[in-house]
């Protein structure tokens, strides 16, 4: 269908927005309020995945063409960073129009086509919604600065002085000297927690809250499965506070959740709150109600500690952060990840830990960005296949729903001489042909060059080559996702660390019990044992609770000796791991059922 409404426009000082009824709607999947707990997420940058029209930029139609690959891999949900209309001064997180798709990506109808095709394959799609701020080119901001007494005059946080909220930290210390910027048109300062071209919305204005709820409903009406709410801790400002995690923010999130539960059951809100776990759990809402704010939240502090634990060859960085993680409501789930489109953030570590991570993983100053490291997974791990597999096994087995980053399943590298975080946002490497099979455009027109490194370049690292090799990282990753999908324990099971005398080995049980139709119960118990050392390591585990059970290695279905009363001895190769299903012993022949 031809799109006849090209985004928002201003009429008589009022910004008019299109209606979802102006567009087609994607088919919906059966309502399942717990799907996100079982899902494997896959973050893909639209511009980086596949170019359908040879303009050098990936687009929505190109992503639609590659859905069969995503389905084959075993992904349950795509996470798309912002694809809205934007001047692209911050990778699309500076939104110019919430109701329009960036023209180089396509149209709203192209998105509906993508969503419908994904749902036909059983794949869900969530996208980022930047609630905290807009681009300074957004019509709301332009109306606000030109007409202070008009309907949008109070849509942003304005002040005659830059002295307000002095306790709020500056997030982008590399580029910003203040959270206030003077506007020569309105002759006032405006508030921004991020870049100065991203003014913060004023959520103390009820009209702003209603406007953002309307944005939610527009995309939900089209059929989208949920949103990652970007930068949610910063929605409100109060004197005498650091302007983060304020009660008013949680009150607004409860409004968003109620709209979802009442009008769009089965859709999901994921909080992006780069905070300590004790602070983040508040974004799940009231545990007595099962959670009444966000369904999911990222566990940011866990990720750097996985890297730290393996480099230190000690389980304690992981053990300690998990021990500090409070319980979450029954309806909630953590999202966990190794890498994404941003730098490997080191905000949630101590100064000493940050220095250690820089020394170990960012020896070249160009590898640093803001308070983090701008590298992909494979180069961070020196392209060591054993380490890559160990990290992936941890990602897939620790508590939470895992998020993969496009290209990590084939071991893509980065280009550190590209600016800002573009080093980890290069084109997907499909084939060894020109432009890595990403685009038919002339190479000079590509949005970023494909990686041509001797180790990580597309001539050697690409999907086509790895599809043909049964031992490739791609096929190994697909197999691990398939194994994980067969066991509810990974998705919703309890987590119990087993300790042990060897600090280089991290062992834990994931366990869930399901009621059966005959009134009985069935337990799915998985034992995960991870060697964080580069050297072979022995471990003795107290498994008396499982005496008589048989550990069955889950990738090769190999039975290990049954568990007895004595400590269970295992030896793991360097950076090796085991996943065991603990299987009940078969009944003795002739035993009564």
UniProtKB/Swiss-Prot annotation:
Pathway: Glycan biosynthesis; glycogen biosynthesis. Disruption phenotype: Cells lacking this gene do not accumulate increased amounts of glycogen in the presence of trehalose and show only a small effect in alpha-glucan. Combined inactivation of treS with glgB or glgC completely blocks alpha-glucan production. Pfam families: Alpha-amylase (PF00128), Malt_amylase_C (PF16657). One of its GO terms (biological process) is polysaccharide catabolic process. The keyword Transport does not apply. Substrate binds at residues 90, 133, 198, 228, 341-342. It comes from the Bacteria. InterPro entries: Glyco_hydro_13_cat_dom, Glyco_hydro_b, Glycoside_hydrolase_SF, Malt_amylase-like_C, O16G_dom_2, TreS/a-amylase_N. Optimum pH is between 6.0-6.2 for the amylase activity and 7.0 for the trehalose synthase activity. Ca(2+) binds at residues 132, 200, 234-235, 237. Homohexamer. Belongs to the glycosyl hydrolase 13 family. TreS subfamily. This is Trehalose synthase/amylase TreS. It comes from Mycolicibacterium smegmatis (strain ATCC 700084 / mc(2)155) (Mycobacterium smegmatis). The gene is treS.
């Amino acid at each position: 269908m031809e799109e006849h409404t090209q985004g928002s426009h201003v009429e008589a000082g009022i910004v008019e927005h299109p209606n979802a009824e102006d567009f087609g709607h994607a088919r919906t999947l059966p309502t399942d309020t717990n799907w996100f707990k079982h899902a494997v997420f896959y973050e893909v940058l639209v511009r980086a995945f596949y170019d359908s029209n040879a303009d050098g930029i990936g687009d929505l139609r190109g992503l639609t063409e590659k859905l069969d690959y995503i389905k084959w891999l075993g992904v349950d949900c795509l996470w798309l960073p912002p694809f809205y209309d934007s001047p692209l001064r911050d990778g699309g997180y500076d939104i110019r129009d919430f109701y329009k798709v960036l023209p180089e990506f396509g149209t709203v109808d192209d998105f509906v086509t993508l969503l419908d095709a994904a749902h036909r394959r059983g794949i869900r799609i969530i996208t980022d919604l930047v609630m905290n701020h807009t681009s300074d080119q957004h019509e709301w901001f332009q109306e606000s600065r030109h007409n202070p007494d008009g309907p949008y005059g109070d849509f942003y946080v304005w002040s005659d002085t830059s002295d307000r909220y002095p306790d709020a930290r500056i997030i982008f210390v590399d580029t910003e000297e203040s959270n206030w910027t003077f506007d020569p048109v309105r002759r006032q300062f405006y508030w921004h927690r991020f870049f100065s071209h991203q003014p913060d919305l004023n959520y103390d204005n009820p009209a702003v809250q209603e406007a953002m709820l309307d944005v939610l409903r527009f995309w939900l009406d089209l059929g989208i499965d949920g949103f990652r709410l970007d930068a949610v801790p910063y929605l409100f400002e109060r004197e005498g506070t650091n302007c983060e995690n304020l009660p008013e923010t949680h009150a607004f999130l409860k409004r968003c959740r109620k709209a979802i539960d009442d009008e769009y059951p089965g859709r999901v809100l994921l909080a992006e709150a780069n905070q300590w776990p004790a602070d983040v759990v508040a974004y799940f809402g009231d545990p007595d109600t099962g959670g009444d704010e966000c369904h999911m939240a990222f566990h940011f502090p866990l990720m750097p500690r996985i890297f730290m634990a393996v480099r230190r060859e000690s389980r304690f960085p992981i053990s300690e952060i998990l021990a500090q993680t409070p319980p979450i409501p029954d309806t909630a789930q953590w999202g966990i990840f190794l890498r994404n489109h941003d730098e490997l953030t080191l905000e949630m570590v101590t100064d000493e830990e940050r220095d250690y991570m820089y020394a170990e993983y960012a020896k070249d100053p160009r590898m640093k960005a803001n308070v983090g490291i701008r590298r992909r997974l494979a180069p961070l791990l020196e392209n060591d296949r054993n380490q890559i597999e160990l990290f992936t096994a941890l990602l897939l087995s620790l508590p939470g729903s895992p998020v993969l980053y496009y290209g990590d399943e084939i071991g893509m590298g980065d280009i550190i001489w590209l600016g800002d975080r573009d080093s980890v946002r290069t084109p997907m490497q499909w084939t060894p042909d020109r432009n890595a099979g990403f685009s038919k455009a002339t190479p000079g027109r590509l949005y970023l060059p494909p990686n041509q490194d001797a180790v990580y370049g597309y001539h050697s690292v690409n999907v086509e080559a790895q599809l043909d090799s049964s031992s490739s990282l791609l096929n190994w990753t697909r197999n691990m996702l398939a194994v994980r999908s067969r066991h509810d324990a990974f998705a919703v099971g309890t987590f119990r660390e087993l300790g042990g005398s060897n600090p280089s080995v991290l062992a834990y049980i994931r366990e869930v019990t399901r009621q059966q139709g005959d009134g009985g119960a069935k337990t799915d118990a998985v034992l995960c044992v991870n060697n964080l050392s580069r050297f072979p390591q022995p471990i003795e585990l107290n498994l008396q609770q499982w005496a008589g059970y048989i550990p069955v290695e889950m990738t090769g279905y190999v039975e290990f000796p049954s568990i007895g009363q004595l400590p269970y001895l295992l030896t793991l190769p360097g950076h090796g791991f085991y996943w065991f299903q603990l299987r009940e012993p078969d009944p003795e022949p002739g035993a009564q059922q």
